[in-house]
Design a protein with these regions (language model features):
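C-terminal folded domains that constitute the principal catalytic or ligand-binding module
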Residues: 99, 103-119, 126-147, 158
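Short, conserved secondary-structure transition motifs
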Residues: 149-155
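Local cysteine-cluster metal-coordination motifs and their immediate loop/turn environment
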Residues: 12-18, 65-72, 118-129
Length: 158
């Protein structure tokens, strides 16, 4: 636990804060490129801002994602947001424990399932921990899964 706290508090000591560049080969866009529409179903999306009793939670599959994941993983909307109510947060930048609010969202609403999408960096473990705590404290048995994105934007094996 002490290491996690140090990682969250001290950006100079956290491996997730280390500056890196990724060399990528240019990608040719097909001539028939059609922009994909957003799959976002509700607003707000920030865990800190969403009301725990919002009507869109009723019967929802919930996506709880680290802020960076949508930037790192190119097909985020299609692979993760589509069909889900989306909440985002960053345990490193938001000086708050999400577990209490997430517990109330799970307790007060008819949530069908929970998917957590996090980055591979250690500090992102705080988001997974908050969701795990909320699932343990909500008084319900809900199906859930964790997906991890690499800093290179790849979906890692479970």
């Amino acid at each position: 636990r002490r290491q996690r706290q140090m990682c969250i508090r001290d950006s100079t000591g956290c491996p997730g804060s280390m500056a890196r560049s990724m060399e990528r080969a240019p990608v040719n866009q097909p001539a028939s490129f059609i922009p994909m529409p957003s799959q976002l179903r509700q607003w707000p999306v920030q865990i800190k801002l969403v009301p725990v009793n919002a009507p869109y939670f009723d019967g929802a599959s919930l996506l709880i994602a680290a802020d960076c994941t949508a930037y790192a993983y190119a097909n985020f909307h299609q692979d993760f947001i589509r069909g889900k109510v989306t909440l985002v947060g960053c345990p490193k930048l938001d000086d708050v424990d999400y577990s209490e609010k997430l517990t109330e969202i799970l307790r007060q609403n008819n949530i069908k399932s929970v998917t957590v999408v996090r980055m591979e960096v250690p500090c992102c473990g705080g988001l997974e921990y908050a969701v795990r705590t909320a699932l343990q404290n909500c008084g319900k048995l809900l199906p859930w899964q964790v997906k991890t994105i690499s800093i290179k934007g790849e979906l890692l094996d479970d």
